[in-house]
Amino acid sequence: MTTAPSGLPGTPLPPARRRERPRWPLLVAGAAVLGLIGYMVLGNANSNLVYYVLPSEYQQDTAKFAGKTLRMGGLAKDVVYNRDTLALKFNMTDGQVAYPVQYQGAVPDMFRNDAVVVMEGQMQQGVFHGKSLLVKHSEEYKAADSKGEGQYSQDDLKKILNDQSTKP
C-alpha cells in the first residue's frame, strides 16, 4: 500500500502529472515534410513535362525542342506498315508541314491513312522516331472528300488532339 508523503496510512497519492510537451516542434516538422513533398512534386514537374506540338509549330522553333522528348500530333499520310517486322513509316502533317515518322511496334486497330495521331518520341535528323502511338478521333463524324481523304483544318486537328474525353 502506498502512502502519502505526509506518512498517513491510507491516504492516496495525487494523480501523476504528465509534463506537457510544446506542440510547435510537431507543427514545424509537419510543415517541413509538406514543403519537401511539394518541392519534390512541383520541382520535378518541369523535367517530366512532355511538350505537345503540331508539325508546323515544331518547324517554327526546332531549337527549343532539340534533344527533348515531345508529343507531335497530326494526320498520318502515306502509311506503310509491315506486319511481320512491326515497322511503321508514315508522314505526319498538319496541312502545312509534314515530317517522316518511324515507329516500331504494334499499331492500334483504328490506325489508318488520314487518322489523327499523337506520337511521343524524339526528332533525329529530320525524322521523328516514335516510342508510343495514340490514335485520336472526333466525336463528330466527318465525311471523306471526293478523293476519299478526311478534311481537317488545323483548328479541327487541335480540337481533336486536345480533347481529353476521347479514348485512344
Curated annotation (Swiss-Prot):
It comes from the Bacteria. InterPro entries: CcmE, CcmE-like_sf, NA-bd_OB-fold. Coiled coil: none annotated. One of its GO terms (cellular component) is plasma membrane. The chain crosses the membrane at residues 24-44. Residues 145-168 are annotated as: Disordered. GO terms for biological process: cytochrome complex assembly. Belongs to the CcmE/CycJ family. PANTHER family: CYTOCHROME C-TYPE BIOGENESIS PROTEIN CCME HOMOLOG, MITOCHONDRIAL (PTHR34128:SF2). This is Cytochrome c-type biogenesis protein CcmE. The gene is ccmE.
